A protein has these predicted regions:
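A short, compositionally biased
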Residues: 1-2, 14-15, 27-30, 136-145, ...
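Intrinsically disordered, compositionally biased repeat/linker segments
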Residues: 1-45
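Disulfide-bonded cysteine-rich modules in secreted/extracellular proteins
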Residues: 4, 20, 47-55, 170-183, ...
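Surface-exposed loop/edge segments in extracytoplasmic proteins
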Residues: 27-28, 41-43, 48-50, 82-83, ...
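Surface-exposed ligand/attachment interfaces on beta-rich extracellular proteins
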Residues: 52-67, 145, 149-150, 183-187
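Glycine-rich strand-loop-strand elements at beta-sheet edges
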Residues: 54-60, 74-147, 163-178, 236, ...
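Aromatic-lined ligand-binding clefts that engage carbohydrates, nucleic acids, or primary amines
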Residues: 70-72
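Acidic, glycine-rich loop-and-strand cores that form catalytic or ligand-binding grooves
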Residues: 151-153, 158-269
């Protein structure tokens, strides 16, 4: 972007917003030109919203000149894995695996940042599921974190905690099945909720009139919250009873489904999560097999763009 500087108190300062008085009213300047060698050259363009970037692996980004805010359309911690089912030899029952939990989330929140600072985006991995077994624990999802070299911590979205099945044996006792736990959201920065900015096409909008501030997964501006636990069917009663695995916890306040339950019916393993949702758990006494494995949790993400809020 073209930059324009003025000298103020012996120091050069970059111009981020400029106005001209026209017919007794102040109008914001959108573009400025200067004639150089007989040709008009651009020396100023008002800052407009950048395009969205989706970060799916840990990295850094520099806040561009002129920007003073980041719009996080979607961010979520990693979902936890699903627990595999367990089958027994005349122990009086069978065990289903708990579904994984989703990570905490942010949907359409705007935070202040400083131009030129480095933002670190840490993306939480999805947790691994387990095979079938009598003492197994699904892996947790990783934390998704946004922080700035000047701004400091902006948010930490904890990943889901995996469930478990413990204390069982092939001829009994039946194992104890513990549920997964949704990740917790820690919002360190205060979200911005008012002001005006320019969309990428140059249109001037306010927070109330913008149509791009509620297009995240939740569909409502300024939302954040904790993740959701998967279901935990537990044990069924009777030798060779059939039981389906748990369903993974949905992410983004129920707007992204969790992984599907492992069979029966059918002999599929627990389904994988997506976009921070929990994985499905495995079932027991499925057709053609004894029990099935849990799936992998959905990885985290941060989808963002930069704005200049006035």
């Amino acid at each position: 972007m073209t930059s324009w500087y003025i000298k103020a108190s012996s120091a050069w300062k970059q111009v981020n917003q400029a106005f001209v008085k026209s017919s007794s009213a102040w109008k914001e300047i959108q573009e400025g030109y200067i004639k150089v060698g007989g040709a008009w050259k651009s020396f100023y363009v008002a800052f407009v919203a950048t395009g969205f970037t989706t970060q799916t692996s840990t990295g850094t980004v520099t806040v561009p000149d002129g920007a003073n805010a980041i719009h996080v359309q979607a961010a979520v911690g990693g979902g936890s894995g699903g627990v595999g089912g367990a089958d027994y030899d005349k122990a009086g029952g069978e065990s289903a695996g708990a579904g994984g939990a989703s990570g905490a989330y942010v949907s359409d929140e705007v935070y202040s940042v400083t131009e030129g600072e480095t933002l670190t985006l840490t993306i939480g991995a999805g947790g691994a599921g387990t095979g079938s077994g009598y003492n197994v624990t699904a892996s947790n999802g990783g934390n998704t974190v946004l922080s700035g070299s000047t701004t400091g911590a902006i948010f930490t979205l904890a990943g889901g905690t995996g469930g478990s099945g413990t204390g069982g044996g092939v001829q009994g006792p039946l194992r104890s099945n513990s549920p997964s736990v949704g990740g917790s959201a820690t919002i360190n920065a205060t979200p911005l909720t008012s002001g005006s900015f320019r969309e990428s096409d140059g249109t001037s909008v306010t927070f109330n009139t913008a149509t791009t501030l509620d297009q995240g997964p939740v569909g409502t501006f300024n939302q954040s919250g904790n993740g959701t636990a998967g279901t935990n069917p537990g044990n069924c009663s009777g030798d060779n009873c059939q039981i389906s695995g748990g369903v993974g916890g949905s992410s983004y306040a129920g707007n992204v489904a969790g992984g599907t339950a492992g069979g029966p019916p059918g002999s599929a393993a627990g389904g994988a999560g997506s976009r921070g949702s929990g994985a499905g758990g495995g079932g027991a006494q499925v057709p053609g097999a004894f029990s099935t494995s849990g799936g992998a949790g959905g990885a985290g993400e941060i989808k963002f763009r930069f704005l200049r809020i006035n």
